[in-house]
């Protein structure tokens, strides 16, 4: 039924259509009836106040909206500019304060660093002076003994002698060293340790006499007798056994004759000749 009503409404000719009042009045006389399904169709006329009221209002709003913005825009930049200036001034003031605080902190840190550097330099100077003061003593030799680490032929200053002495000629240290216990024994000469014998010169004299004995046999009997008498008169001279055995008979005869003894003893002899057991050949020939 509803579809039929819609079809009837659409098939309405344009010449026969009248006002709604007229259609309503002539509804009983064969006119078309109003459809309930489309109530806004009859309201869409040229004289309807809905479109007339809304259209100019929409246009007025569209025209007045930019005008309102145009009135508000010139005032807003002034306010923003003043607030911006105030904000910039505040930022500049804060920047100045921050800069001053940062500068003060930098100055304080620089002063602390310089003070710490000065303290460190002063401490290092004191340490250098303290460490250098005992090292200066090492240049003065305390002990006169030569150092085993020093080379041969170097000179050392001796405080006792007040002169430079070679390291080889220095006496050994009186304090024994554990590393050099046997150096004095090794360096000591064996000649100094052995005492000279008392019989040394006597043995040497006897050896010299025995060496010269073969020459006496060719000098004659008188030379041998005089030498034997001189040896017997001298208690420090030892007579060899060979001469005593070979000339025992001649020595006995010479001792028994007092004339020969007196002649040998009374003859004038120089001190040098008396000291020597030998008599020159000239004196024997003159006798």
From Swiss-Prot:
| Compositionally biased region (Polar residues) | 259-270
Q: Does the keyword Zinc apply?
A: no
Which superkingdom does the taxonomy of this entry point to? Eukaryota
Bias category Low complexity: which stretches? 178-189, 246-257
Disulphide connectivity of cysteines:
none
**GO CC terms in record:** cytoplasm; nuclear body; nucleoplasm; nucleus
Keyword Aminoacyl-tRNA synthetase among UniProt keywords: no
Main location group: nucleus
Residues with the modification Phosphothreonine, per the entry, are 47, 149
Q: Which GO terms describe its biological process?
A: mitotic G2/M transition checkpoint; positive regulation of cell growth; positive regulation of proteasomal ubiquitin-dependent protein catabolic process
Quote the subcellular location field of this record.
Nucleus; Cytoplasm
Question: Could you give the subunit structure recorded for this chain?
Answer: Interacts with PPP2CA and PPP2R1A. Interacts (via its N-terminus) with PPP2R2A; the interaction is direct and this interaction inhibits PP2A activity. The CHEK1-mediated Ser-37 phosphorylated form interacts with 14-3-3 proteins.
Q: What is this protein called?
A: PPP2R1A-PPP2R2A-interacting phosphatase regulator 1
Species, as recorded: Homo sapiens
Gene name, per UniProt, is PABIR1
């Amino acid at each position: 039924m509803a579809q039929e009503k819609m079809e009837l409404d659409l098939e309405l000719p344009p010449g026969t259509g009248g006002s709604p009042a007229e259609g309503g009045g002539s509804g009983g006389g064969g006119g078309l009836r109003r459809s309930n399904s489309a109530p806004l169709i009859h309201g869409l006329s040229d004289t309807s106040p809905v479109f007339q009221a809304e259209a100019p209002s929409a246009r007025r709003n569209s025209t007045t909206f930019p005008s309102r913005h145009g009135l508000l825009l010139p005032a807003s930049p002034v306010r923003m500019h003043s607030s911006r200036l105030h904000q910039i001034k505040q930022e500049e003031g804060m920047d100045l304060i921050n800069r001053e605080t940062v500068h003060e902190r930098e100055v304080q840190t620089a002063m602390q660093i310089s003070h710490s550097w000065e303290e460190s330099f002063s401490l290092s100077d004191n340490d250098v002076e303290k460490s250098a003061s005992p090292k200066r003593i090492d240049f003065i030799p305390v002990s006169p003994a030569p150092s085993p680490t020093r080379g041969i032929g170097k000179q050392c200053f001796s405080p006792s002698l007040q002169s430079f002495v070679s390291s080889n000629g220095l006496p050994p240290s009186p304090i024994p060293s554990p590393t050099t216990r046997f150096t004095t024994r090794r360096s000591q000469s064996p000649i100094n340790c052995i005492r000279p014998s008392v019989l040394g010169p006597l043995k040497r004299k006897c050896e010299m006499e025995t060496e010269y004995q073969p020459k006496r046999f060719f000098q004659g009997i008188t030379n041998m007798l005089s030498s034997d008498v001189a040896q017997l008169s001298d208690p420090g001279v030892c007579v060899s056994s060979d001469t005593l055995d070979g000339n025992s008979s001649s020595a006995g005869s010479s001792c028994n004759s007092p004339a020969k003894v007196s002649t040998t003893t009374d003859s004038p002899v120089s001190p040098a000749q008396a000291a020597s057991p030998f008599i020159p050949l000239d004196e024997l020939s003159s006798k």
